[in-house]
């Protein structure tokens, strides 16, 4: 009887440690307001007052995977993107964040459901209808329709036979299917 009590006590202690560890590792509630607040803290750890005026522009789950993408803007600066992972407690943690270097950025993202092509960007002019990415090391092209919103996050599952989903040559297309990559880039530079 005493051994059973000890084993039960040990089991409870281990369970408490595991739950506490998971809560510490995945502190973000799965909602836009909580993600925005944690991004503010994450992006400006080194700022003097510890605050940031980050505005969350888009927040999406990649298919039915454990991965979420947050697209945010910082006034007077460029946009940024963060990758968040979900723990078994349904809470999130920030894996990585980066400032976007282009009007539309392409990347590959690995999830528990496979590898996805990821487009994050801005479409303030509303001229971008589609975005294409031709993989450099494979003969595969991703073609995605761009929504008529200022900011967007798009993803598409990459077939498992593709070994090198990054890098890719990205092309922005208008309604007529014409390449407007340079035009949109120049227009963005003039707006800034």
Protein language model regions, located:
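Exposed beta-strand-loop-beta-strand "reactive/processing" segments of non-cytosolic proteins
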Residues: 51-86, 180
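Short beta-strand edge/turn micro-motifs at domain boundaries
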Residues: 85-99
